[in-house]
């Protein structure tokens, strides 16, 4: 009897944590764009990039946090721009559901060292299965291709 009560209490406590706490939709390291690889509707960045570190987390309530460090070009054909963000002055995070952009953040600055952090809330459809988070470039004032993502195509 005591074992059954203990098991019931443990299950109730776990259910309470799952319902009352913030549930994670996705928590992942990020990988840099290798060059010509679109992810769903988001085109590739056009050049190879590298990333010292990156992580993204999306919670069920839409809370989104993305942080990258050392996101810079990794393409010798870019000459002196290699190892820099080369004109990419900002990034926006997009949440893809089934390959389509379901939500996108405002642009935040990308430092000359390739560092950026986004903390915001987005509205993602409740039926979004296996979301992918991509970090998109702002170059010459326009949002373009992806530079880093939580999964590769």
Residue ranges of predicted features:
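Transition segment at domain starts
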Residues: 20-62
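Extended, low-complexity, turn-rich repeat/linker tracts enriched in Gly/Pro/Ser/Thr and Asp/Glu
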Residues: 72-78
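Short, well-ordered beta-strand segments enriched in hydrophobic/aromatic residues
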Residues: 64-72
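C-terminal motif of bacterial Sec signal peptides marking the signal peptidase cleavage site
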Residues: 15-16
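Conserved aromatic beta-strand anchor motif in extracellular beta-sandwich/beta-rich domains
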Residues: 93-97
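Helix-rich interaction surfaces within compact, conserved domain-sized segments
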Residues: 100-153
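Short coil-to-beta strand junction motifs in C2/discoidin
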Residues: 79-91
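Bacterial N-terminal signal peptides that target proteins for export
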Residues: 1-5
């Amino acid at each position: 009897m005591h074992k059954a009560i203990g098991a019931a209490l443990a299950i109730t406590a776990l259910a309470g944590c799952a319902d009352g706490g913030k549930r994670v939709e996705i928590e992942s390291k990020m990988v840099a764009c290798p060059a010509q690889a679109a992810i769903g509707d988001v085109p590739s960045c056009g050049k190879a990039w590298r990333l010292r570190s990156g992580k993204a987390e999306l919670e069920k309530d839409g809370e989104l946090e993305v942080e990258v460090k050392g996101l810079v070009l990794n393409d010798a054909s870019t000459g002196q721009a290699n190892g820099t963000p080369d004109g990419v002055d900002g990034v926006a995070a997009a949440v893809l559901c089934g390959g389509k952009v379901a939500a996108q953040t405002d642009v935040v600055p990308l430092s000359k060292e390739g560092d950026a952090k986004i903390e915001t809330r987005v509205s993602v459809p409740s039926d979004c299965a296996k979301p992918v988070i991509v970090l998109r470039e702002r170059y010459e004032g326009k949002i373009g291709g992806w530079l880093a993502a939580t999964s590769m195509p």
